């Protein structure tokens, strides 16, 4: 019997061992590829995310506070830092979540409903704010609205019913808040709409009992956004935090009215950190 002959059982054992090794390598390679592709997709979508989450170098957002107070915080920040402003946007708007949709009929969550997942998000702006953002006039009558929407059904409708109140769709709009006002709800839902109404106070009063909320946003682009970016954000965070504490009734728990600070530097850093961590895991 020649010495170089391998028994059949030994050969089968080695083949099985090699097969397991190859399968393990294939699985690990697939995992690495999936991770790399995922990280690349996130990085490729970074620009869209930043436009949605942080359209300006520095910003202050308010919940259930007036626009004047929000703007004052930004003015204080600019005075303390000496940053030179190239562009500023200051707006007040409403937003609410859709509980149910039947064609063009919308049901809004009530004020007391908690821990809900909306089918869609709607942001509401006055026609004065629309003109401020676009330079264009709409001249809406009392029962008319203008609409930008990602909802396919709404795009073909002539009217819209919101909690039993009917509105005629005067015209369909382009994305008029892009690069001007953040829409963080894009992360939660892919279906969202922006309404323009003739009088935002009348619209808000017509939505009593619903979960509709009021928000403000003041964002600025500065001459040198990289100058002291982290230090500046820390200062803006401090200013917003102190102002929140001074709001009436804010003692314990999660406040109903509050200010929050944000910066493009911080948002971009979070995305880059997430991509870097994903690549490291891969």
Residue ranges and their predicted role:
Residues 18-42, 263-282:
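Hydrophobic alpha-helical transmembrane segments of multi-pass inner-membrane transport and secretion
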Residues 1-29:
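N-terminal Sec/SRP start-transfer signal
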Residues 3, 34, 66:
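Short, contiguous, pocket-lining structural segments
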Residues 32-58:
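Hydrophobic alpha-helical transmembrane segments and immediately flanking/interface helices
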Residues 50, 56-63, 67-281:
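Basic-flanked hydrophobic alpha-helices used for secretion and membrane insertion
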Residues 16, 47, 225:
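Residue-level marker of positions within ordered structural domains that often coincide
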